């Protein structure tokens, strides 16, 4: 089976015929706890008082978190709402606050990068909504996908866009496997500094390589 992936750079806002669904309906992976106050944060509120102030700032960052889903759509897009929408001089915006779409090549059991959402500055105003058409001209068969979230920003919500008549479901393949989790703690390198895009944070690369969260 050959899946032809044609990444594109057009804003999803400009295209008709999409149906958007809230990403919390699907599988959120690479979190240590499920009882966080928001779906895309990494630490439960009960542990915040014991964290340093700089660690609390990182609490809202979605580094390493991804959403798994399956669809037969010929086009895939996303819209997401950034918490801060700030920038850093020493790191690409695609790493700070972009998103990455990956496709599971089931014949090789390998995740392949499809495309990256390149954030629009929008005057660096907080509460910024970003839109991206990742890919079009797919084969219309059911495939497995994953969207990685920003490394040095957080999101309030994420919507996945597909063709209006397409199926959009929970993943049908168990990848990553449900057999324990890997704990990663360290310097800013583990957070993702200064990866060029969000799928290249060490925790995400380990997840794809070993098929574990």
Write out the residue ranges for each language-model feature.
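N-terminal secretory targeting modules
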Residues: 10-181
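Charge-rich, low-complexity terminal tails
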Residues: 7-9, 194
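Short helix-loop-beta junction
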Residues: 203-213
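Catalytic nucleophile-elbow at a beta strand-turn-alpha helix junction centered on a G-D-S/GDSL motif
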Residues: 179-203
């Amino acid at each position: 089976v050959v899946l032809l992936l044609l990444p594109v750079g057009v804003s999803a806002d400009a295209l008709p015929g999409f149906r958007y669904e809230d990403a919390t309906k699907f599988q959120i992976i690479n979190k240590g706890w499920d009882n966080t106050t928001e779906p895309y944060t990494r630490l439960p509120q009960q542990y915040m008082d014991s964290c340093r102030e700089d660690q609390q700032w990182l609490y809202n960052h979605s580094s390493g978190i991804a959403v798994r889903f399956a669809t037969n759509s010929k086009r895939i897009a996303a819209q997401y709402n950034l918490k801060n929408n700030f920038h850093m001089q020493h790191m690409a915006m695609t790493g700070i606050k972009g998103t990455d779409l990956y496709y599971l090549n089931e014949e090789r059991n390998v995740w392949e990068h499809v495309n990256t959402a390149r954030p629009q500055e929008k005057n660096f105003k907080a509460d910024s909504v970003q839109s991206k058409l990742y890919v079009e001209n797919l084969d219309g068969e059911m495939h497995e996908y994953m969207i990685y979230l920003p490394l040095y920003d957080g999101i309030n919500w994420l919507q996945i866009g597909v063709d209006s008549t397409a199926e959009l479901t929970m993943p049908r393949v168990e990848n990553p496997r449900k057999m324990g989790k890997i704990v990663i703690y360290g310097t800013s390198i583990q957070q993702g500094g200064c990866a060029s895009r969000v799928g290249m944070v060490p925790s995400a690369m380990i997840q794809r390589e070993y098929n574990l969260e």
